[in-house]
Every structure is written in C-alpha cells, then in structure tokens.
Amino acid sequence: MEFAEFAARAAEIESEPADLETVDLVATLCADAGDDLGTVARFVQGRVFPAHDSTKLDIGPSLCYEALAKAAGPNVDSDDIERRLAEVGEIGAVAESLDLGGQQGLAAFGGGTDREALTVSGVEETLQALAAAAGDGSTDAKRDRLFDLFNRAEPTEARFLARLVLGEMRVGVGEGTVRDAIAAAFEVPEPDVERALQVANDCGLVAETARDDGAAGLDDIGLVVGRPVKAMLAQAGTAVEALDEWGTAAVETKYDGARVQVHYDGDSARLFSRNLEEVTEPLPEVVEFVEQSLSVPAILDGEVVAVDDDGTPRPFQEILRRFRRKHDVAAAREDVSVELYAFDCLHVDGEDLLDTPLSERHDRLESLLADGVSPLSYADDADEVADIEADALDAGHEGIMLKNPDSTYTPGSRGKNWLKRKPDVETLDLVVTGAEWGEGRRANLLGTFVVSARADDGYEPVGKVATGITDEELERLHERLQPHVRTEDGTDVDIEPAVVFEVGYEEIQQSPTYGSGYALRFPRFVGVREDKSPSDADSLERIDRLTS
C-alpha cells in the first residue's frame, strides 16, 4: 500500500466523529491493506512496533523539527517550525503546511526532481532502521533518514508521518476500535479477537491471523515465553464488597515494589516491567534466582521489592533506582538488595493457565518455586481480612490485595476480580501535560505541573500540582520533563504526555475550571510512576466512578 493511500484513509477517519462509522472505515482500511495489514493496524494507532515490543524510535520533537525544516528548504529552520507549532497547535498541521521537497537535489539522496513514492512498508523499514541506530553519529543518521522521508512526502503524507514519528496519530483510533474493525473486516467474533489481542499483545499479528485463518486461527494464538503481555490490574474495593460478591476472598500482601513479569525458557530468564520494558539487566539477582529455581519454561507475575539485609522492605523509590540503573549494576546491587515475590502463574511448560482459576494457578506456582512465592490466604469474614492486613502492615508492606479465588487471568483488564485495599491517602496516577515556570529561587525551573487523566482521545486536565516537591526533586523533574516541552507561552508550558505522577488528594470536586469537569482538592505530589506509561494512567471513567 502506498503511504499516500494510508494517509488519505487516515484523514477520512480523523474527520469522522461517529464511533461506528470510524470502526467501518478502519475495517475497510484493514481489508484493503494486503501484505501491509499488520503494519497498517499498528500505524493507524500511532504505533511502529507491536505493543509487546519495547523498542523505541527515540526521536524527540527537536530532531523531528530539524528534519522537517531541512526538507522545507534553506529558508526554514527549527525555530520557524516551533513558531508555527505555537500557532496551529499540533505537528501534523505544521508538516502539512510546509512546502516539502525543497532539498531534493542533495547528492546524499541521489538528486533528481521526481519524488519516489512512499510506501507503508518502506516507511516501516526506515523507522525500524531509525530505532536501531546507535552510537557515534546516530543522531545525524536519524535526522538524515527522517529528512529523506519528509523530503518525499506530499502534504497529507507529511501530516501523518510527523504524527507517527512522535507517536501521536490523533485520529481517534485506539485498541478497542482496531479490535472491532478486525472483527468486522474478517467476519470473526469480537470476543475471539479480544482474547487473541490479550494473549498476543500485537494487533498486527491478530489482524493477519483473523484474515488468514479465521476464528480457529485466533483460538490457536497462545502465550509465548519471551513475549510479554499486559498485566492484570486491580481496582479499589473493600473487604465487605469482596465477601458479599465472592463469599470467600483470597488475600495476599500488597507490596510497595515494582511489578515484573518473569519469562523463563528453560535456559535463561528475562524480566519485563508493567510497562513491558525489559528490565533483565538491572536485576541480575532476580534472574539468577529464577534460573536456579525453575526447571521448566514458565511465565510468572510478581513484584520486585527493595529490602534491607534482614528482609525488611525499603521505600518504593529504592527499587526504582535499580530499575533505572543501566551501568555499574554490580555497585547498585551492593547498595540496594531486591527480592522477587511471585504471586501468579500464567504459563507452565507449554500450558497456558489464563483460563485456570486463581486458586489453581497459585497451587501451580507453589509447585514450581520452593521460595519467593507470595503467600495466599483465604478469608470468609471481614475480621479475618483485617487480621491479615494488620500482619502485612506490621511487616512494613503497603497493604493487602483481595482476589476472587475463582477468577481467571485477563491481561490488561482492570475489573472487580482483583481489589486493592490500602490504608493510605487516596492517589491517582496522572499524566503531566503542562507546567508553569516557578517563582523566586525556582524561577529557572518548571514549578507547577498540570496533571491530566486519560480521555477517549487524549488527556484532560484535573489539576495543578506544586506542593510535596523538594528543591532536589524539582530539579530532577525539570531535567526529566525538559526534553518533552512542546511550546511555551509566557509562563505556560505545553508538555508532551510522557511522564506519570502519582498525585495524592483530599477530594475530587466537580469544577468548570477544566474540560474534564473535575478538579482535585489539595493535590500533592507523591512521586513519579516510573513503571507506568501515559496509557496506564487513571482515566476520566475511573474518576467518574470515584465521584459517583
């Protein structure tokens, strides 16, 4: 498929406000994609790689602006791009407005006056090469490859190419739309597509399988050791709710650590974060433990916790120091010890256990590991739950989890089968989408942060956070967010959604101040959720539930 055809279809999808018609348009796009089906299914969501693949393009706004300016000719520079961006508000519109192709005569790209048409597969290959570029000269190489794409792009192509490069397709298509479109395009049941997406974590693979092998092929898609899936999630709840619903509750400790998914292929282990980033290298002692303890291939779910020499848990920030460490891991290991608490078993020796009840999955887990298994207790009344919770808190842990003993494991879902019960202040995980410059001694730092919840198509602000941040933390946050700054207008700064804050609050109020309709009362910075991406942040739907 030529990229011009994809861009034209994407423009049509963007202009369609109705959800059902959008699904139909995406379904038609998938049906017409031919050999590019897998790529098209990802591109329309703004993805270059499958969801399970943590490979990143590593192209920031500045590099994109430079490539665009170069393709626009000698009379345009990056500052011009940023000025236009401030005027129109999004990079796609800027790219579309430029007269690209002004540098075709450059010898580096063969000269000539005819533009070689972009294709979907060609764009994918170039972006994959961009992601693989590393070492000295890689920045220049990325800029030149990106320039070549923009230099060959027609206006509509440039709009969606720029958005794709920065991961912001802005056409209102998410995983749910693609799921429904695959089902419609290839006449397979939507629940079958949903299950396959949960297991494969790759919409391209699922789309191709649905087209080529139908429902039977989707049913054959299983877990693969080394291919991570999204973690099953919990929502807030009470012991009374759990016992009323289930009769008996499975109760386990809620650790103040970081979620990990363990993949062991029979020889070596790999670890993945909740965000599906590989964290094998920073956690060698966990890898060693798994490789010494397991005798058959398996996929486990668990938590890695920083501990003192006596096993007492250390603060959450300590484990994040280990997750972020890429160099001198041995020294970090000496400084901060970690332990694995496995609490679920998804796959054992070729057998998927997603549809197996929790109680049985935990039994299988205990048969695999002699140590490192999070204990699972069963309670029939609220007093028993309270006793277990007290023991967990006395041991220095965060609280408890309540789980339905009969529940299956549904990757990526947040439902009533897992409930988290914490005694601490209520918090939300929110995306930083803006900031304001500080005052006084903080005048050279971003000092107040706009935090937003996930919405149907983007993010909606629910408050501003300035309290709870030390001067040292503020400097770190400033450095962390500076590469994601899009535009500035006076003291107001627009920030690309990339960093998730955990924000404490006293109350959620209805308010006309923000487009979300809500405002946090007394919001307070708790920390950065290094284990979460913007797509994992709390949604407006959850805030609706909390306020109802």
Curated annotation (Swiss-Prot):
What is an annotated GO biological process for this record, any one?
Answer: DNA biosynthetic process
Offer one Pfam family short name for this entry.
DNA_ligase_A_C
UniProt-listed Enzyme Commission number(s)? 6.5.1.1
Cite the SUPFAM superfamilies for this sequence.
ATP-dependent DNA ligase DNA-binding domain (SSF117018), DNA ligase/mRNA capping enzyme, catalytic domain (SSF56091), Nucleic acid-binding proteins (SSF50249)
Cofactor names: Mg(2+)
GO MF annotations in UniProt: ATP binding; DNA binding; DNA ligase (ATP) activity; metal ion binding
Keyword field: ATP-binding, Cell cycle, Cell division, DNA damage, DNA recombination, DNA repair, DNA replication, Ligase, Magnesium, Metal-binding, Nucleotide-binding
What's its catalytic activity?
ATP + (deoxyribonucleotide)n-3'-hydroxyl + 5'-phospho-(deoxyribonucleotide)m = (deoxyribonucleotide)n+m + AMP + diphosphate
Q: Which residues bind ATP?
A: E252, R259, R274, E303, F343, R414, K420
Q: Say yes or no: keyword Flavoprotein present.
A: no
Active site, renumbered: K254
Q: Which InterPro entries does this chain map to?
A: ATP-dep_DNA_ligase, DNA_ligae_ATP-dep_bac/arc, DNA_ligase_ATP-dep, DNA_ligase_ATP-dep_C, DNA_ligase_ATP-dep_cent, DNA_ligase_ATP-dep_CS, DNA_ligase_ATP-dep_N, DNA_ligase_N_sf
Keyword Cell cycle assigned:
yes
Q: Which family does it belong to?
A: Belongs to the ATP-dependent DNA ligase family.
The task this protein performs is described as:
DNA ligase that seals nicks in double-stranded DNA during DNA replication, DNA recombination and DNA repair.
In Swiss-Prot or TrEMBL terms, this protein is called DNA ligase
Q: Which organism is it from?
A: Natronomonas pharaonis (strain ATCC 35678 / DSM 2160 / CIP 103997 / JCM 8858 / NBRC 14720 / NCIMB 2260 / Gabara) (Halobacterium pharaonis)
Upper classification of the source organism reads: Archaea, Methanobacteriati, Methanobacteriota, Stenosarchaea group, Halobacteria
